[in-house]
Amino acid sequence: MTDPANTLRSLIFDVDSATNKATLSVLDQLRLPDETMYTKIVNVQDAWDAIRSMRIRGAPLIAVVAVLGLAVDLSSNELTIGELDLISGIDEVKAFVTTKMEYLKTSRPTAVNLFNAMDELKSFIDDDAIKTREEVVSAIVQHAYLMLERDVSDNKAIGSHGADDLLSRHVHPEGVCVVTICNTGSLATAGWGTALGVARELQRRGKLRSIAALETRPYNQGSRLTAYEIMQEQMPNPILLCDSMAASYLKSKGADVCVVGADRVCANGDTANKIGTFQLSIIAKEMGVEFFVASPFTTLDVELESGDMIEIEERPDGEMLESSGAPKGMKCWNPAFDVTPAKYISGIITEKGVLKPSADGTFDVKGFVSMHS
């Protein structure tokens, strides 16, 4: 198995210890798998554009890039530094930074990780102990670096908890057969991955028997990105499926579990994820295949009672039509996400542990969050 730390880097972040200036480059995922190109992020607008255009994507990575982009903007961008030079009071400095945070939130509305990251950072700099502009900038740069490290360690914990849970039931000597959708690996995070991280941990233990990835139309994150990661990691018995093949595959080939990511998990367990996840969950239920969500603890949004309250981002028509061969002038509906009702979910894997439904089939996400906060 190839070491993912040496093969797949969704971003490159560095801080000069002498000057505290930060630099950031992100892997342009729209060019994969044909071309590997990193793009420099020098300000908040660059970070916003990279997120909005889906040059970077994946709920955990979106949050990380937003925070890192802000750190670079404040510490290294001469235009922003010049604007800060014109501000005298600490309250005005914090207000200036908060405006940039609020702008970053507008880049993509569905993933809660972005909002949580900005809110956490705002609480951090609002501390009365931070009294100067230099302390604000230094605190944000330090927080960005710690967030980057935390994302990788959290992802590895997600993989470990997920593998432990699955192997407690699936005892085939060659391991577990996994199906996944979209991309939830190193390219969707700061490293290792969430749902694909569970498969990676199974592989590390010699207990991944096979992995099937849905292509994930219309952006083909499964065929372009997940298949790329699977091949890089030399995962056993890989197979790529059209989205419409999922039912036939589960019926004729069989699988032990579907493991998917999440952009937001509501208080009742309803989960927003990449479009196509909902239908995969229905198929899995019909076929008696377990269906797990793997996501960071920060994806749990107890402020929303159910999936009916989630704002679903809709992408431009062209993103679908240009890759589908449709006739000119055809209209389409292009939601980026759908919501899987909690009743189709077998469990929610986080770095804190695995949340299972109660005897009546409902999830107590609020209780889980309260217990681990």
From Swiss-Prot:
Task: Quote the PANTHER family the UniProt record gives.
Answer: METHYLTHIORIBOSE-1-PHOSPHATE ISOMERASE (PTHR43475:SF1)
Its chief place of residence is: cytoplasm
HAMAP family to which the protein is assigned, alphabetical = Salvage_MtnA
- The EC number(s) attached to this protein equal 5.3.1.23
Q: Which UniProt keywords apply?
A: Amino-acid biosynthesis, Cytoplasm, Isomerase, Methionine biosynthesis, Nucleus
Site for Transition state stabilizer, residues: C182
Q: What does this protein do?
A: Catalyzes the interconversion of methylthioribose-1-phosphate (MTR-1-P) into methylthioribulose-1-phosphate (MTRu-1-P).
Q: Name one GO biological process term.
A: L-methionine salvage from methylthioadenosine
Q: Which family does it belong to?
A: Belongs to the eIF-2B alpha/beta/delta subunits family. MtnA subfamily.
Identify the pathway: Amino-acid biosynthesis; L-methionine biosynthesis via salvage pathway; L-methionine from S-methyl-5-thio-alpha-D-ribose 1-phosphate: step 1/6
One Pfam entry name: IF-2B
Q: What is the lineage of its organism?
A: Eukaryota, Sar, Stramenopiles, Ochrophyta, Bacillariophyta
**Which GO CC annotations does the UniProt entry carry?**
cytoplasm; nucleus
This chain belongs to the protein called Methylthioribose-1-phosphate isomerase
Subcellular localization, per the record? Cytoplasm; Nucleus
UniProt catalytic activity: 5-(methylsulfanyl)-alpha-D-ribose 1-phosphate = 5-(methylsulfanyl)-D-ribulose 1-phosphate
Q: Which residues form the active site?
A: D263
GO molecular function list: S-methyl-5-thioribose-1-phosphate isomerase activity
